[in-house]
């Protein structure tokens, strides 16, 4: 198994969403440092802003459903062209959000690449036929899956796993890879992680701030309600500050409003703005491993 991180630049439109939500996180983090306590409303605003920051790393489409500013889906198409140079090669593409796969579907359709889409809303009676098609149909070369849809799947007839985004909990990342890199896999597995440069994703990657499964239910969408207290809240806030650089942001731009603002989910992106010049993604092979981990 080889793991590779591909660093992808952000467009100005993406950065606007990301940074506005980062300011919300910074204000709530400042309140936490003053009072060592957050209301449930503040905790909900915090988790919403964190999710918005992560979604903006993929595309503005996930936030406004009108525009599609972002390079990740295009970089994926380039990567798949390389993968498909090997006869019969297939790829499994994961994202937490079905909106990411909606963007990808457009790129696949433009290139007439056949695929299946697997998510939590797929009826159980249809799941078997989708998996069988991906396994047996030589024309179907891409398996798109959300985390909710991918639980328990065996997809070892593919040898490439592509993560469009990083889950908060590294155990979820390993579960994704484990759909392909598992007992009985005879081929070398290539794992590619797309990371948005200069964003919360880079902070998550470098600091491993959310290493413990303590926060999985809160930040991976499994918890219906968000409520932390005591030691769990303290550890959570410490990780948030590390991953987002909230403390540094406040030192540079002190918040004048001491109350936490709402998360930004629909302003400005639809306005006319120059598209950033597309830059080549920077790749880094950061880890190789043999055998199952």
Over which residues does each language-model region extend?
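SF2 helicase/translocase ATPase core recognition
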Residues: 1-23, 141, 145-225
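Cytochrome P450 catalytic domain signature, combining two hallmark sequence patches
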Residues: 24-32
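Conserved Helicase C-terminal RecA-like lobe
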Residues: 1-22, 34-143, 147-151, 222-265, ...
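Conserved, well-folded catalytic cores of nucleic-acid-processing
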Residues: 28, 53-59, 183-186, 211
